[in-house]
């Protein structure tokens, strides 16, 4: 397996730490006036999703994680697993609830998602940046009710709750940014 030195650390790099794949979020190289240089790294453990900060001596080396990102289409959820398919080879992969996590509320059938595989098992699922979902439940917007600019909560077809403008009604389709969970616009 290939190794990587702390001198080569950069955001997005995936390496093994304590036999668990980790991804670097931020890396800062520090050279104090006295003593040895070091890297202050903010990283995310890919299996547990936990974020932590660590410092590594300059020149330390680590094994690169054998992690692969693949684009797959979301098919369905059978209650236990979420099923995805490669649209070229038609190979199907099942991801458990732990791998999907909070992203389940943004999964729409036939949307292309990014799955991170480690040892051919899905460890994280990333939905597309934007999804279009139907509003299934929201309060009616009252005419003249413009006192607050915060909008109103709306429940979407996947169960996600998003703040929308007052003019959005039940049955309308809205575009939502899955990274922030914010309303982007109304789909015509």
Curated annotation (Swiss-Prot):
Pathway: Protein biosynthesis; polypeptide chain elongation
GO molecular-function term, one example from the UniProt record: translation elongation factor activity
Domain of life, source organism: Bacteria
Gene name as annotated: efp
PTM summary: May be beta-lysylated on the epsilon-amino group of Lys-34 by the combined action of EpmA and EpmB, and then hydroxylated on the C5 position of the same residue by EpmC (if this protein is present). Lysylation is critical for the stimulatory effect of EF-P on peptide-bond formation. The lysylation moiety may extend toward the peptidyltransferase center and stabilize the terminal 3-CCA end of the tRNA. Hydroxylation of the C5 position on Lys-34 may allow additional potential stabilizing hydrogen-bond interactions with the P-tRNA.
CDD domains: S1_EF-P_repeat_1, S1_EF-P_repeat_2
Keywords: Cytoplasm, Elongation factor, Hydroxylation, Protein biosynthesis
Chain's role: Involved in peptide bond synthesis. Alleviates ribosome stalling that occurs when 3 or more consecutive Pro residues or the sequence PPG is present in a protein, possibly by augmenting the peptidyl transferase activity of the ribosome. Modification of Lys-34 is required for alleviation.
Gene3D superfamilies assigned: 2.30.30.30, Nucleic acid-binding proteins (2.40.50.140)
Primary location class: cytoplasm
Listed HAMAP family: EF_P (MF_00141)
Transmembrane segments: none
Subcellular location: Cytoplasm
One Pfam short name: EFP
The organism of origin for this protein: Aliivibrio fischeri (strain ATCC 700601 / ES114)
GO cellular component: cytoplasm
Family: Belongs to the elongation factor P family.
NCBIfam families hit by this protein: efp, PRK00529.1
Protein name according to UniProt: Elongation factor P
One BP annotation, GO: peptide biosynthetic process
Modification N6-(3,6-diaminohexanoyl)-5-hydroxylysine occurs at: 34
